[in-house]
Regions:
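Activation-segment/catalytic-loop signature of the eukaryotic protein kinase fold
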Residues: 93
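Terminal C-lobe "cap" of eukaryotic-type protein kinase domains
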Residues: 268-273, 277-293
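Activation segment signature within eukaryotic-like protein kinase domains
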Residues: 130-131
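Protein kinase glycine-rich loop
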Residues: 27-34, 38
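Activation segment
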Residues: 171-173
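Conserved short submotifs of the Hanks-type protein kinase catalytic core
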Residues: 97-111, 115
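Glycine-rich ATP phosphate-binding loop
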Residues: 37-61
Length: 350
């Protein structure tokens, strides 16, 4: 960045100087929202090596309170925990005064919406590969009991070698607490990708809502169009539950039966009837390319780590609950009840 470009609502000269001391140089702005901007950035690893990154700058002084108390802490927690080849990974997070600087992998070929706009509908074989990569990333997230809650074409990035990565975890959250599924009550995401249960305004299971949104992404890739084109929430909901959508005539005869079935299973108004991301990784449509049904070594090892992390957290919660129960018994224990508590302690220590 040069001249007046260095100073705007988000970044100041002081911010840029501090970042440069850490080896990070912000270049041109490539996206912006109400209280966040995204820049292309360079990380000078050493005198001979540098990496091109994206930097999301969040100005908390401009953000609403509910974002600061709920969404931002969740996003940071998720970003720190996740690591998967088809999810945009974070390289560094810095906080300076009221601002967060989040450095992520840069997507050389932009997002999926840009790709569709420039290149048209995606051939089925390419869709199969990209959808398999998206499902792999979401299966990993869901296995960690994390829901994305804002799946859309703009949040699928395309790398230099034309692989895809899921990005933007501003609405992501943990969806299990003490072994129980947490229903979401917040309207999240974009209208065109929102599941009917989200539009209805009732508590919903966010993992299942993610799967609906993935169905919309798949349809959009194949058709270069959305299945529902309504700006009215009421009319959109009615079309969703009545299944009023169809493939475009220009592509319908080019698609395999398995592909069309896959879309239909995902754009399913009954949330409980939608398939999971994990089950779709070996579904008939993906299996038309047999090698895609096999996880890579990295995918498999990271998934196992994610599952083990969830198990460890559950054990920690169980132990914490038991300690809390004993403490409560101690508080309540009087007279003859005290002996029972002491015996209980001994039985636990055996």
């Amino acid at each position: 960045m040069g001249g007046n470009e260095k100073v705007d609502l988000i970044t100041t000269q002081s911010d840029l100087t501090v970042l440069q001391e850490k080896g990070f140089i912000l270049e041109k702005m490539i996206g912006e929202g109400s209280y966040a901007k995204v820049y292309k950035a360079t990380h000078m690893v050493d005198e001979t090596r540098h990496a091109v990154l994206a930097c999301k700058v969040i100005d908390t002084a401009m953000a609403p309170r509910d974002y600061l108390t709920k969404f931002l802490p969740r996003e940071l927690d998720v970003l720190i925990r996740i690591n998967h080849p088809h999810i945009v990974n974070v390289s560094n997070i810095f906080q300076r005064r009221a601002k967060y600087f989040i450095f992520l992998r840069f997507a050389e070929n932009g997002d999926l919406l840009d790709f569709l706009t420039q290149n048209g509908a995606v051939p089925e074989n390419q869709c199969r590969l990209w959808m398999r990569q998206i499902l792999s990333g979401i299966h990993y997230l869901h296995s960690m009991d994390i829901a994305h809650r804002d799946m859309k074409c703009e949040n699928i990035l395309i790398t230099s070698n034309y692989n895809v990565k899921v990005t933007d975890f501003g609405f992501a959250r943990n969806v299990v607490s003490r072994g129980q599924q947490i229903l979401s009550e917040t309207y999240c995401g974009s209208l065109s990708y929102a599941a009917p249960e989200v539009l209805k305004g009732m508590p919903y299971l966010p993992k299942l809502a993610d799967m609906w949104s993935i169905g919309i992404i798949l349809y959009t890739m194949l058709n270069k169009a959305l299945p529902f084109n309504e700006t009215s929430v009421k009319k959109l909901y009615e079309k969703q539950v009545m299944r009023k959508w169809r493939f475009r005539t220009s592509v319908v005869n080019q698609l395999s039966t398995e592909c069309k079935q896959q879309v239909t299973q995902l754009i399913e108004p009954d949330a409980n009837s939608r398939p999971s991301a994990g089950s779709l990784l070996t579904a008939p449509w993906i299996a038309m390319e047999p090698k895609l049904t096999k996880m890579t070594f990295l995918e498999d090892s990271l998934l196992k780590q994610a599952i083990e992390e969830v198990k460890r957290k559950e054990l920690d919660r169980e132990e914490e609950s038991e300690v809390e129960r004993i403490a409560e018994l101690r508080r309540q224990g009087r007279g003859k009840g005290t002996q029972c508590i002491q015996n209980l302690d001994k039985s636990i220590s055996k």
